[in-house]
């Protein structure tokens, strides 16, 4: 039995029936499909075949800012009523690498705060590298290769996440330099080839001491391996440092029982919105002063753009909304600068 959905490569729930009356009692040398005692009685789709992005954006006007934010959090499985406004923004920030191209996010903090949940369970376009281990060839492709592996993971995924930065080890001595090139420009050289990709990079890890003690003895990037810790230029390419110690540890009350978007819809929404750029909304009301160098401005703009695409996809933002997101974006970039 072939259902029309099989041609669309979709997922569904099938109910099988026993077609005993259809069985042929005659002995056959070769059995055909008609001899099967089973048939598909019904099929219920459980995955969206496509997303009407404009229709979804149009629905934004019927929600207040907080209602839309809460809907996004519930769609990711979280219960916003258990979170403060700052905590809710932290959880939304975790989604920015999924909706903003070439975005570099670092989140370090205590264990058990659900750092990898978004990238493992919510989006099929993100890959989680367990233990933070990979190779240069796996991440950036093989030199002078004409095969599909020429571009590596950054060319095949929207987001590449290292779930334990302490385990990041590369045998290739040029790996850190290649990663810096990619994080800065979205391109890198492999042999004779110059390759472009738009995957975002997420670096996650654990801080096993209090932040106060860490700052007294070292810095907030300490969990990274020595080959990274000795290179401040690498950290300067990180757009936002998400303070994991400000996020509550996961507990049953943080898991929502309310309705939200199905994950297919949320992930497709993020993927489609990656093509858009909302950075120009900053310039309607604000200008960067001389305290911001070029990398600072790029980092803040990209964080702002990602948050704005998530929370204001219809671009209906007033000055207070822009300032709200801009303040949050600057805070995360300042945390990076203070460690350099």
Describe each PLM feature range:
Residues 239-340:
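Conserved NTP phosphate-binding and transfer environment spanning the P-loop NTPase/kinase superfamily
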Residues 79-213, 218-222, 236:
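Conserved ASCE/P-loop NTPase catalytic core
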Residues 93-95, 189, 224-229, 252-255, ...:
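Short secondary-structure capping micro-motifs at structural edges
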Residues 215-249:
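A short helix-turn-beta junction within AAA+ P-loop NTPase domains corresponding to the substrate/partner-engaging
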Residues 72, 95, 179, 266, ...:
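Short amphipathic C-terminal alpha-helix that caps PH/PH-like domains
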